[in-house]
Amino acid sequence: MGNQFSESLTRYQLTVFEDDWGALQRGIEKESLRVKSDGHISRSPHPKALGSALTNPYITTDFSEALLELITPVSQTIDGCLQELDNIHRYTLQNIEDEEILWATSMPCPLSADT
């Protein structure tokens, strides 16, 4: 962990607010593009194993079939959110085409074969 980040964590840990912070509920939405091994955006339809993009509360699409949104249920802990995201992400990876990967961002970036 970076020194500045550690200092910030220490600085803002105010015991007066601990009960309030514990009552927070949180969720994560993570976008990823399905990308083929050649670095181009996948043109294949939304994988059936991921359920309907319109009704699955955890895996949906954004502006295109290839842009997945992974959505965690609400959790009271950061660890709970991250574990749910990990579970959804792993399930998604197991159920997309073999030659597809999940691009880490929603910005499309075709890659050349030399990359």
Predicted features and spans:
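Terminal catalytic/cofactor-binding subdomain
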Residues: 1-115
